[in-house]
Amino acid sequence: MRTGKQYLESLNDGRVVWVGNEKIDNVATHPLTRDYAERVAQFYDLHHRPDLQDVLTFVDADGVRRSRQWQDPKDAAGLRVKRKYHETILREIAAGSYGRLPDAHNYTFTTYADDPEVWEKQSIGAEGRNLTQNIHNFLKLLREKDLNCPLNFVDPQTDRSSDAAQARSPNLRIVEKTDDGIIVNGVKAVGTGIAFGDYMHIGCLYRPGIPGEQVIFAAIPTNTPGVTVFCRESTVKNDPAEHPLASQGDELDSTTVFDNVFIPWEQVFHIGNPEHAKLYPQRIFDWVHYHILIRQVLRAELIVGLAILITEHIGTSKLPTVSARVAKLVAFHLAMQAHLIASEETGFHTKGGRYKPNPLIYDFGRAHFLQNQMSVMYELLDLAGRSSLMIPSEGQWDDSQSGQWFVKLNNGPKGNPRERVQIGRVIRDLYLTDWGGRQFMFENFNGTPLFAVFAATMTRDDMSAAGTYGKFASQVCGIEFGGAEPTAYAATADYAKALDKGLAPEPAAAESATS
């Protein structure tokens, strides 16, 4: 298994990365990037800790010990083992503050692995090349070398006023095909952690009007000639004492420019078919979304814990009004946990033999978090009061004259004054810093914004009058409604529906998605 040292050494490979106004010479050592690089290194090193060996690693069929990120769950019990793996990683690294560690990034490839053949059969313009084998080969490479392959799917936010605008946009597109590969030119507008990846996973999110040359699913090394990664300004803080979370690094969102970049056919998974891409805005990220829900449950748990700590330290925890408000936070956490458990218990087996959690339940669980994150943030900040804002600096606290006043200002019925400052600093990092503000924005748009979560999830079951909900209501009303005509969901390609409910496609299910 890869070590953190090996990972850090691999980053000094000539990749072209900007962070704000600075061009980064070495991602592993530059002050704007080194802290998060250390967090990814920590991810790898956790797998070598003897006390975590049984939780984070397994021995595969060939007798090789590997990270559990590569273990495929075969039943609900196996899925719970994977959940424990992800939870442990998240708890150990900045309390679940980073949504794009390697185990999350690499999860997208599970969707390919569940049914790789259709990515080749649905391609247009690949001239019979064995793209299915490309998928198998790249999955093997990821697993054998423990690589980190961030997602680079989001296209520029340019003219959204008409479908025709897609063709005029600077979206990444194929500009030439050769016997050896494709040449692409253009932009991917938002990717998280791209600067820290070994490879980047290129894909697209379908929009009406997208031309076939913009439909590209592939993987390339981050240091590929012609690739430049432009990261936003870093929000990392330099003082671990003052900023216990924000000092641990910024995973950095970025825009990637591809200037006539060559991609060998061996690294291409699918090209050319908007109708195929139309089926995957959510499905390609299914396992990532499950990981998101695990992290959101952990974040909800942290919010409850911080509320309990600060109200006990202040001395307000026994007040009925305060207790009732903390109870709301507990209810939020338990509701999130219920979505997670229910998705696991109502899962199904995919064509590839994996036991997959129920997408409708975990996606609506993600929506529940987004609907409530503003209100739970407000509750925590209000319960904390000035304790999350009026925090003495280390210099003020240690000063021989002023320090005594800050001890008195932070004294309470439980704990010591210094502990209240520590609690306040964590709350401040989460919600009252630019680092925390970026976290909030990431949650809003990570795995699609709220309206898109609802819209996309509603296309993954028959929500028409002929569907389960409609049939029951029709029965109660004593009517027959909507049963004759085929529904939109029924017309969806079987191979896509198999990712929603575990349907077993017939041999002909890999026919064109347009037929």
UniProtKB/Swiss-Prot annotation:
Pathway: Xenobiotic degradation. FAD binds at L151, N152, F153, Q157, T158, D159, R160, T192, T457, M458, T459, R460. Substrate binds at R100, L101, P102, D103, A104, G203, C204. Changing H289A: Loss of catalytic activity. Its EC number is 1.14.14.-. Coiled coil: none annotated. Keywords: Aromatic hydrocarbons catabolism, FAD, Flavoprotein, Monooxygenase, Oxidoreductase. The keyword Flavoprotein applies. One of its GO terms (molecular function) is oxidoreductase activity, acting on paired donors, with incorporation or reduction of molecular oxygen, reduced flavin or flavoprotein as one donor, and incorporation of one atom of oxygen. It holds the Pfam family HpaB_N. GO terms for biological process: catabolic process; protein homotetramerization. Homotetramer. The chlorophenol-4-monooxygenase is composed of an oxygenase component TftD and a reductase component TftC. Belongs to the FADH(2)-utilizing monooxygenase family. Oxygenase component of a two-component system that degrades 2,4,5-trichlorophenol. Uses FADH(2) supplied by TftC to oxidize 2,4,5-trichlorophenol (2,4,5-TCP) to 2,5-dichloro-p-benzoquinone, which is chemically reduced to 2,5-dichloro-p-hydroquinone (2,5-DiCHQ). Then, TftD oxidizes the latter to 5-chloro-2-hydroxy-p-benzoquinone. This is FADH(2)-dependent monooxygenase TftD. It comes from Burkholderia cepacia. The gene is tftD.
